Each structure stands twice: as structure tokens, then as C-alpha cells.
Amino acid sequence: MSEAALTRSQVAAMVDHTLLKPEATAADVTALIDEARSLGVLAVCVSPSMLPIRADGLVTAAVVGFPSGKHHSLVKGAEARLAVDQGATEIDMVIDVGAAVAGDYSAVLADILTVREAMGESAILKVILETAALSDEAIVECCRAAVRAGANFVKTSTGFHPAGGATVEAVELMARTVGPGVGVKASGGIRTTQAALDMIAAGATRLGLSGTRAVLDGLTD
């Protein structure tokens, strides 16, 4: 699908409307859910502590090991299992970025496998790589580990790392590496319509956005 062919509703159907600020309140998350419904997006992505707030009619994603990825793998697994039990249908987990930087891809694989096994097969697993902090080689190897572990998506960024967020180059590399059977979620710093379209053109099949309205307002149906 070309950029010119994309309508507002088509892009909205790729969006995880996201609120992960540590100061977010229950009222903020309720407002996020209401806005997500009004915008017609696919999903909301929230902190697991906010899962008791119902988001009927929307896919609900929760983050795990967020944002550092330095939690013990068993803690990540328990967090993912609890999130699924509380209604999350998708899990966005952060890898141990330090292990990736060190080239310890066996540890990266084991970390992802622990979460995948703990959460079960009923929910979608997205694996956050923090690509701005990684070399191209590390991005490729972490993508391969995610595929081997049974992930459904690889994801660029938490949006909280000082190295930055999603780039077209990282998305292209991830899409080439995982192939058509695994999705690519671009997130972190996508604030304009053109930036979103550029990510889609590069191979992103899902977008993590906090400023969703501003992005969608640049499109028509």
C-alpha cells in the first residue's frame, strides 16, 4: 500500500494510543481510553497497574520490564502473566538492552522466552529493542532472537531512552530481518503525519503514538 493510498481510518487501525508517563493517573488513563474510542484506533498501551480500568472495544496492551528492561526475567514473566490475567491482550516487553549491547544474544533470547512462556500463547508479544542504543548488528541479532522466541512483533523503542526513538533506518532493518510473518512496531518520537507515513513506508505495521490526534488530523478518509 502506498503512502498516498492510506486513509485516516487505515492509519488509525495501526495505532496503539499510548500513555506511559509515570505521573499518569487513573483519570488520565480513562481519558486516554475515551479518546482512543473517539479516534477509532486499534489499541491502547498502558502501564500494567492501570489494567483494572476497562477498555472495552479496544485491544489493550501493557508494558513489561518498562522502561529499562533491567528487571529479572522471572519478574518480567510474572508481570506479563499478571497483566494477561487482568485483561491485557498484548504485552510490550523491554529486552535487557545491556545484554544486547554486550553481544550476549543468548541472554536476550532467554529473557524473551521466559516472558513468552509465562504469558502463554493467547496474547500478542511485542519485543522492545531500544534500537537507538544498539548497533545494526545488535538490532538484527535481537530481531532474530525475538522471532525464535515466538514474538509477534519487534518494536523500536520505549520512548524514554536518551539515545532517541524510532528511525526509518531501524524500521527498515527490522522489517528486512523478521520478514512478513512478524510485525514491526515503530514508537518513540513519532509526532507528525509525515513521520508516521514514513515509518509505514519503511515497513512498520503498528505505530505507538501519544500524540495520536495530531498525526491523524493530517489524514482524510
Curated annotation (Swiss-Prot):
Q: Which GO terms describe its cellular component?
A: cytoplasm
Q: Which GO BP terms, alphabetically? A: 2-deoxyribose 1-phosphate catabolic process; carbohydrate catabolic process; deoxyribonucleotide catabolic process
Q: What catalytic reaction does the record list?
A: 2-deoxy-D-ribose 5-phosphate = D-glyceraldehyde 3-phosphate + acetaldehyde
Q: Where is the active site?
A: 92, 155, 185
Q: Thermal profile, per the record?
A: Optimum temperature is 65 degrees Celsius. However, half-life of the protein at those temperatures is low (approximately 2 minutes).
Q: InterPro entries from the entry?
A: Aldolase_TIM, DeoC, DeoC/FbaB/LacD_aldolase, DeoC_typeI
Localization, UniProt: Cytoplasm
Quaternary data:
Homodimer.
Role this protein plays: Catalyzes a reversible aldol reaction between acetaldehyde and D-glyceraldehyde 3-phosphate to generate 2-deoxy-D-ribose 5-phosphate.
The record's listing under HAMAP family reads:
DeoC_type1 (MF_00114)
PANTHER family cross-referenced by the UniProt entry: DEOXYRIBOSE-PHOSPHATE ALDOLASE
Q: What is this protein called?
A: Deoxyribose-phosphate aldolase
The gene name reads deoC
